[in-house]
């Protein structure tokens, strides 16, 4: 038995090299802005002998539009589990993953993977990359000065018109993502976050239109991080990790801008971003090798340490800096996760209605 284990250990580097050698050429990745540690990509290129061409987007609508047109040319994409990933699975737009080429699949947290299995039975088409919540990015120094009793852990802070009017002078923003914003508004209104009911959508639109005159911007993810970090805005509805990135940049700038994140106490929108391979990917072998490389604990620790989003590889946690590992805004406590909701996947008709709603919201003043 010992000899067999020793032989397996001796052969392991050769087996890994062989698996990576089977995936040659160029890997085309399409991912969110500021959503990976560049050093991880560089290590993959060195070890696999595969050049990575890396493009970025800052909204799910941009990603889905590119994939819906077909022949995107990408080997790896990173759609959010619901609704984008769910729709792509249903449409047959994603390739089933070859688990034999992804031995590090075993590192994934089965509890989290079970959450996405409802839209991808058997987890055949995707592995969780990173996850997080949608909540409030707050410039704490300004908001506390303006309103010491402000309800920082509630969407009331932004969505109640009288509160928005009170804080408008220091800059308010909502990320340009109907997929993420509308479910949060519906939840705040006490409605089903995945509702297709015309009355529910009208109520959500009314809330957004009442907020619109007080907004300084409706930016994409990357621009919103910059606006928070520089203090241009003081309250934003956005992704948890974007706020944490903005807080880190603000500290580095040393100008006294203090940024914090608050998940709504009534329940936050929980999302999972998935590593997936388009059905017409030009280099699926390289895609499987890249997914396997990312699922190494050391890779995921480096990524979480850089972008400040939690990952789904528990073995990476001991490798994280204590300040990251123990930060409840990065890894929420179990009680907060129990209150969180995954918004579900609206029907195509409901999605079209939401898109029209969002267009009217953006165009209004």
How would you label these PLM feature ranges?
Residues 80-85, 89-216, 222-225, 229:
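Extracytoplasmic ligand-binding site segments that recognize negatively charged/polar headgroups
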Residues 83-87, 235-256:
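A ligand-binding cleft/hinge motif common to bilobed small-molecule-binding domains
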Residues 95-106, 253-269, 278-281:
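Short beta-strand->loop
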Residues 137-142, 187-190, 271-283, 302:
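A bilobed periplasmic-binding-protein/Venus flytrap-type ligand-binding module shared by bacterial periplasmic
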Residues 201-211, 218, 255-276:
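Periplasmic-binding protein-like
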Residues 278-339:
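Mature extracytoplasmic/periplasmic domains
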Residues 334-365:
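Conserved C-terminal helix/tail region of periplasmic/extracytoplasmic solute-binding proteins
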